[in-house]
UniProtKB/Swiss-Prot annotation:
Keyword Plastid in annotation: no
Gene expressing this chain: fhs
NCBIfam families: PRK13505.1 (NF010030)
Keywords, comma-separated and alphabetical: ATP-binding, Ligase, Nucleotide-binding, One-carbon metabolism
One Gene Ontology biological process: tetrahydrofolate interconversion
EC number: 6.3.4.3
Protein name: Formate--tetrahydrofolate ligase
Top-level taxon of origin: Bacteria
Catalytic activity reported: (6S)-5,6,7,8-tetrahydrofolate + formate + ATP = (6R)-10-formyltetrahydrofolate + ADP + phosphate
């Protein structure tokens, strides 16, 4: 089979104006960035369109194909002559050159041109990086200009859209008095910046400016919070993000319209594309497919409890992506053997699928279809076993081969989803906003994850007191934990239950409007692997054609 980039190079793409026309957009509605991408003005009016959320079971380290499945489903609905639009996240440059490679789907379910998407795109990430670093520059300038705000403990870090471990802990201002105040600092990757989360949760330019003004960047020498509004640069930061607030129009290789906008981390943030892009897609199309990062206990929970609360939306159906290999992995098979027949591991690991189905149907009240992303090494007996297991929950399972067949390989899934969309849906939240912070975290950990006990460590206890003192207990919570387990232990696979769940610390994100519960090690600036993907990339200096971008 051809590589991803070879497939996209052979695809005959439509001019972006033709893609926009499918959504009723005229030339004056689009700001073109070449032939194949454009920015459009947000459209946030009410809509009766159907929203389909794509999530997944607990993944292997290889990922299970949520984006590929989202694209395949959209292309399948497009083949059924439905007015459909995807609403997806933008990829970060760091993983592109690191271990993961590109993030535009895979095989014959891809966004294209994939090199445009993976490399710079329309410059949104650069605008977010600049906005983040303007705040850093203002903080350091305030320190240099005799520190009128009495800044003491600084919370804010610089950012860059690249994997570079050497920047995690640095010292700035080493050149002497003329070059600023010497202090410890560090860089996060741009996707981990609070600015990214803010961009994706803001519902208007006015809301964006207010959220920026509310970012807590430091404490003064009396322990009182200092905000961006105290620095006085909220307008300047907002100006840098003015165009980045507009969704980006793109296409699949089967010419399905796609809005690609924003890309927050799925652990320390909510892991979803922007509210503006999702609501604009709902305004323009009859069926909108979006996704949430990691497994459903992380991504879908945050989509519902954070994004849906802010946006006033709810999914009409959920597609739960799984693979035979991930279920074997959750049943104890190692990474080297998950491609081989192993019914005993599958019989144990399938409880992971059951846990995700139960949460989505019973805890969140949503209609579910399971999408089995089929690989060539999957056995028919294994597929039948998973299908029969899903039937016990009253859930249909579609076998999906869109990676090799494009939209045609997801037609069964599309038809199952259309059936579910006819049924009533009653979305429920995991907690109420009136619950205090500790109760919110405890409800998620016990009801969604399956914990038997929740322990708040000393730093978390102190943070709870500070949150209460600042009057922030009504904020939603965003739990940062491993994606490989329902628990906070990456090695506790399957459907873990009754475990002790430890909350190490709480981080206040007053701009984004949530509290991050740290339940494990958080890596905000990744490093490159021993053999980075960058080493496999090449460019033809005569034609400019890129190869090796996978």
């Amino acid at each position: 089979m051809l590589s991803d980039i070879e497939i996209t190079h052979l695809a005959k793409l439509d001019h972006i104006s033709k893609i926009g026309a499918k959504l009723g957009l005229g030339e004056d509605d689009m700001e073109l960035y070449g032939k194949f991408k454009a920015k459009i003005e947000p459209r946030l009016d009410g809509s009766n369109s159907k929203l389909i959320l794509v999530t997944a079971t607990s993944p292997t380290p290889f990922g299970e194909g949520k984006t590929t499945m989202s694209i395949g489903l959209a292309d399948a609905l497009n083949r059924l002559v439905k007015k459909v639009c995807l609403a997806l996240r933008e990829p970060s440059l760091g993983p592109v050159f690191g271990i993961k490679g590109g993030a535009a789907g895979g095989g014959y379910s891809q966004l294209a041109p994939m090199e445009d998407l993976n490399l710079h795109f329309t410059g949104d990430f650069h605008a977010i990086t600049s906005a983040n670093n303007l705040i850093s520059a203002m903080i350091d300038n305030s320190l240099y200009q005799e520190n009128p705000l009495n800044i003491d403990k600084i919370l804010w870090k610089r950012c860059m859209d690249m994997n570079d471990r050497a920047l995690r802990f640095i010292t700035v201002g080493q050149g002497g008095k003329a070059d600023g105040v010497e202090r410890e600092d560090g860089f996060n990757i741009t996707a981990a910046s609070e600015i990214m989360a803010i961009l994706c949760l803001a519902t208007s330019l006015a809301d964006l400016k207010e959220r920026i003004a509310n970012i807590m960047v430091a404490y003064n020498d009396r322990g009182e919070p200092i905000y961006v509004r105290d620095l006085g640069c909220e307008d300047a930061v907002c100006i840098l993000l003015k165009d980045a607030m507009k969704p980006n129009l793109f296409q699949t290789i089967e010419h399905t319209p796609t809005l690609v906008h924003g890309g927050p981390f799925a652990n320390i943030a909510h892991g979803c594309n922007s509210i503006i892009a999702t609501k604009t897609a709902l305004n323009l199309a009859d069926f909108v497919i979006t996704e949430a990062g990691f497994g459903s206990e992380l991504g879908a929970e945050k989509f519902i409890d954070i994004k849906c609360r802010v946006a006033g939306i709810a999914p009409d159906a959920v597609v739960l992506v799984s693979t035979i290999r991930s279920l074997k992995y959750n049943g104890g098979a190692d990474k080297e053997s998950i491609t081989k027949p192993n019914m005993s591991a599958l019989e144990v690991g399938i409880a992971n699928l059951g846990g995700h189905i139960e949460n989505l149907k019973q805890k969140f009240g949503l209609n579910v279809v399971v999408a089995l992303n089929k690989f060539g090494f999957d056995e028919d007996s294994e597929i039948d076993f998973v299908r029969d297991y899903c039937a016990k929950f009253g859930v249909k399972m579609a076998v999906c081969e869109n990676f090799v067949k494009g939209g045609e390989g997801a037609l069964e899934l599309a038809n199952f989803v259309l059936e579910e969309l006819k049924k009533p849906n009653d979305m429920k939240f995991a907690y109420e906003t009136s619950d205090d912070t500790k109760s919110k975290i405890t409800k998620i950990a016990t009801e969604i994850y399956g914990a038997g006990e929740v322990v708040f460590e000393e730093a978390a206890q102190k943070a709870l007191e500070k949150i209460k003192k600042l009057g922030l207990e009504k904020l939603p919570v965003c739990i940062a934990k491993t994606q490989y387990s329902f628990s906070d232990d990456a090695k506790l696979l399957g459907r873990a239950k009754g475990f002790k769940f430890s909350v190490k610390d709480l981080q206040i994100r007053t701009g984004a409007g949530f509290i991050v519960a740290v339940c494990g090690k958080i890596m905000l600036m990744p490093g490159l692997p021993k053999t980075p993907s960058a080493l496999n990339m090449h460019i033809d200096t005569k034609t400019g054609e890129i190869s090796g971008l996978a």
